[in-house]
């Protein structure tokens, strides 16, 4: 066999491996990619956002969660795109999220949330949150609650190549089009909370702990100056302990305000404010 034929055969045989090496990426838990996505998961997790309640009723409300910043050092890829500068991760200061709650048979409570796909500062979220819980205790005393929750959907944003990177001649983004990358948080968890009652039941402090299973998926969507589109996927699986605490203040008979701190000790801390009102008679 001639030398050119040998070279051609080697390229053909090696092509699938080459494509895989330049395609999907599976960084380990100690990589910057995994650590950054774990930080994103802290404010995106569908936390309880209220004190355990034996008689919750129908509720509607709005949550505002602080989005912890990712440092430039941590936003710099270490596995999937080595040599690239920091990703554009700090796009918003806070995340608003509507919440709805309703009682179910057997003393269960369902909470749900949906962030509609409206683009704000380049970010478009289409996120859903669900939780199912069961509370135990006595009115006016200690109340415990066990809860399962999930967050799923997607967020689109120019994370890989924002406008500034497109104008940076030293960046691989230079001369391309602004990326519209997608991250799917895929958070599932269990938690246990304990709450009390003060000020005649108007102030109800609570605290607890839980476990979150994180399966975030990130997909690049960037077209460079040569018209080549990068559709690389980044897959991470993580397990996290979470701690939380807060208090619900009953402002009126129908209106309540909750402040909550929610933390993954190895990643970040977020603060939440949730205003709720009773719905119906």
Give residue ranges: language-model regions:
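Membrane-embedded beta-strand positions of outer-membrane beta-barrel proteins
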Residues: 60-62, 100, 110-112, 132, ...
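Residues that define the transmembrane beta-barrel architecture of outer-membrane proteins
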Residues: 54-56, 91-96, 124-128, 184-188, ...
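Transmembrane beta-strands of outer-membrane beta-barrel pores
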Residues: 64-68, 114-119, 136, 148-156, ...
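Outer-membrane beta-barrel "beta-signal"
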Residues: 132, 267-281
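Transmembrane beta-barrel domains of Gram-negative outer membranes and organellar outer membranes
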Residues: 21-139, 151-153
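Transmembrane beta-strand segments that form the barrel wall of outer-membrane beta-barrel proteins
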Residues: 108-120, 128, 144, 255-266, ...
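Repeated loop/turn-to-beta-strand initiation elements of outer-membrane beta-barrel proteins
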Residues: 106-110, 139-144, 202-205, 253-259, ...
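Extracellular/periplasm-exposed beta-strand and loop segments of Gram-negative cell-envelope proteins
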Residues: 72-77, 82-91, 119-123, 150-186, ...
């Amino acid at each position: 066999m001639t030398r050119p034929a040998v070279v051609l055969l080697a390229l053909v045989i090696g092509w699938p491996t080459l494509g895989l090496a330049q395609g999907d990426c599976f960084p380990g838990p100690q990589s910057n990619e995994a650590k950054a996505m774990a930080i994103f998961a802290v404010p995106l997790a569908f936390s309880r956002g209220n004190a355990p309640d034996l008689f919750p009723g129908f509720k509607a409300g709005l949550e505002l969660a602080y989005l912890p910043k990712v440092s430039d050092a941590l936003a710099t890829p270490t596995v999937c795109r080595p040599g690239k500068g920091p990703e554009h991760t700090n796009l918003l200061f806070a995340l608003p999220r509507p919440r709805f709650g309703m009682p179910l048979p057997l003393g269960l409570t369902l909470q749900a949330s949906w962030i509609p796909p409206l683009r704000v500062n380049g970010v478009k979220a289409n996120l859903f949150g669900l939780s199912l819980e069961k509370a135990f205790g006595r009115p006016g005393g200690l109340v415990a609650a066990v809860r399962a929750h999930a967050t799923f959907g997607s967020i689109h944003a120019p994370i890989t190549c924002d406008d500034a990177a497109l104008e940076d001649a030293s960046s691989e983004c230079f001369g391309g089009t602004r990326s519209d990358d997608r991250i799917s948080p895929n958070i599932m968890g269990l938690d246990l909370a304990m709450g009390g009652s003060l000020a005649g039941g108007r102030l109800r402090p609570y605290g607890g702990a839980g476990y979150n299973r994180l399966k975030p998926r990130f997909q690049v969507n960037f077209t460079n100056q040569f018209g080549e589109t990068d559709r690389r996927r980044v897959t991470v699986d993580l397990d996290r302990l979470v701690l939380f605490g807060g208090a619900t203040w009953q402002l009126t008979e129908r209106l309540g305000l909750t402040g909550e701190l929610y933390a993954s000790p190895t990643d970040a801390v977020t603060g939440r404010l949730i205003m709720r009102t009773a719905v119906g008679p």
